[in-house]
Every structure is written in C-alpha cells, then in structure tokens.
C-alpha cells in the first residue's frame, strides 16, 4: 500500500526520512550532513521519484524509489 507523503504529520515524515538516511549501509562513507540528506529525500518524495510503502503484514513503512516499487501497488 502506498502512503502519500503529504498525508503524514510533518514530525512523522521527518522521523521516517531520518531513519532511512541514517540506516546502516545507506551512507557508504558519505559525509553529507543529515539535514542535506533529509532534504534530498523530501525533494524526491515531492517530485514523485520516491514513495512511502506500507506493508500491512509487518506493519512497517519503507521509502523506495518509484521505479523499484511493484507496478501492482500503483493500480
């Protein structure tokens, strides 16, 4: 299930993005400040390049690039 990013509370969205950009293995030694990484993800969500996917079985949300999301989730 896709969750529109603009329907989340600002604090909730920020925590979700911060969790994503600070997750082990996502920085690859990148020294970019947290605020910049959060801004980039927020922009990708706004442009429709990234989406928030909710898995009802695990009750977890994850950020994904739009082209990596199974097409059936867009129907």
Curated annotation (Swiss-Prot):
Annotated InterPro entries: UPF0270 (IPR010648), YehU-like_sf (IPR036685)
Disulfide bonds: none
Pfam family, one: UPF0270
Domain of life: Bacteria
The family this protein is said to belong to: Belongs to the UPF0270 family.
The protein, known as: UPF0270 protein PFL_4336
Organism: Pseudomonas fluorescens (strain ATCC BAA-477 / NRRL B-23932 / Pf-5)
Lineage: Bacteria, Pseudomonadati, Pseudomonadota, Gammaproteobacteria, Pseudomonadales
